[in-house]
Amino acid sequence: ATSNGLFNFYLRSKNRVALCAIDECQDWFKTVVGYKSTSSAPSMKRLLQCYDGSHWYENKGNTNKRTGVPSAALALTCFTQPAAFLRMVMPKLVSNSNGLLDRFLLCLPLIKSATISERIEASRKLKETNLTSLDKLYERIYAKHNSSDKVMYSLEEEALDIYVRHNQSNLSSDSSEGNAKNDKNIIRLAAILHVFFNVLEQALDQRVQEISAKISAQTMTAAIALAGYFEKQRAILKQVCIPNSLKLDFS
């Protein structure tokens, strides 16, 4: 996920969203936040712009010819060891106060390893279903949304009402910091959950049909709850990076 790599992807793909997954991402983020002098990774400013799908134009070559795209959006999934990330990267993201951290959905789940007997039982149950892998699901989702035609989803009236009431409740509370970004994240999570569970249900029922264009109230309620979980996780992890705050054991 280098800056040049992303830019060239946008030039080739024309208005498609870049999907990136980075394992052990602490080193990549060290470049983003300025620990390393190399300029291979996108800057924090560029990541902020990619969150909103802003334009990206650059002057290339000796002729300074201006080239680029009107919209460059990035969906980024990162995995890391928490100790290194919280020690080296998180303090930089917190101190910059540029809003980049609030655009990420952060979580540090508790470790839970399944026993051998639990895995055997899960494998047995999986073989009894019509779906033994998520690969086909993701392939269908990709094919559906990687065409030249834009796919539009909207909220059912009840779902919109739930979303508006949640937003108004947040505005009247004392913890309104970052609400605008969290509201965007709720909409994005609602769309993700809507598409995934629609395709999952069809796969389990062994049927293929168009994905509903309307996001339900049930899905919106789930998206609000999930966004709230990520928001609380982010707040806790921010506190860990404040001097003299509670230190957690990640060993």
What are these regions (language model features)?
Residues A1-S251:
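Phosphate-handling catalytic cores of nucleic-acid transaction enzymes
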